[in-house]
Amino acid sequence: MNNNSTEYKKLFQEKKYSELMFLIERSKNHQDLLAGEHNLLGITRLLIEKNKKNILLSLDNFENGYLKEKKTKIGLDNLKNFINLTVDLYKIPNTDIDIKKILNYFQEAKNFWGYDKNLMLAIKRFYWRLNEVKKVQHVLSEMINNQEHDSTTLCSYIYSKGFDDDWSQEDFFKFSKFIQEKTPLFKEEELTNLKSNKNKKLKLAFLSGDIRSNHSVTYFLKTILFNYDKRDFEIYLYFNHENDDETTEDFKKLVNHSKNINNLNDLDAINTIRSEEVDIAFDLMGATSSHREILFKNRIAPVQINWIGYCNTIGLNGNDYILADPYLI
């Protein structure tokens, strides 16, 4: 980056973000900043506070970083950050977004660099925000054709197909079997032994990435958690989202145990839940964006049930039942 790179890295690792910004901005004029410095400034601002002012300033950094070095990897990183952050800008009222410019930048970079997974993920998020479902599907289809067979890509694709009517249930089932084939199994020696709970109370675990304000899953689940018989059941609630809010805190008070597993890798999450010896685990995510289907493929409870959150199969052998009514099936 420049002679200050070592100091930049040290301050960033020590989370001295304000000092880092001061050092970068003091060292040269804005127009003389390198692409790497623009990228670092943009990221650092957001780590200090992700408010409207910092989002707009970071967008300016990322855009300038891309324009400064379009044909370098750090320039490409700036563009990925620029597109991803633009998605967040949609949440802020009274902000203008130049859609045409963003799409032109994307196409320009794709023409030069060819296929790049993270660039495709960024534009996929952008198309989702525009409600351009067909374009989302086109991006995901290109990723799958480039051998991106990770569960996130595959589940995103099958989820997107639920928004149009060109797939039959047979098509969904066929693709869900493909997901099943591509979802990895951990070695048995890596996993905590799966044990049945010896207590009289049944241990029920609910896994969701949607226990947040105004999400429909919370309205369905709250009634259950308010009314279950505490003499017969012990409830575990596992969150799979980044930040808790008031709704999350309210739900914690309704259950015996709660834990956020969003930052746990798949193996650690599986072993954490297995160690609790729950009897029945409910998947409230399915193929939605917050999914953790690999946990259920590797089995976290003797009985596993797909319930609210995603109203279809994702073809996993690990899911024993779908809890539904005649209107859903």
Placement of each model-derived feature along the sequence:
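Alpha-helical solenoid repeat scaffolds of the TPR/TPR-like class and their adjacent stem/linker regions
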Residues: 1-329
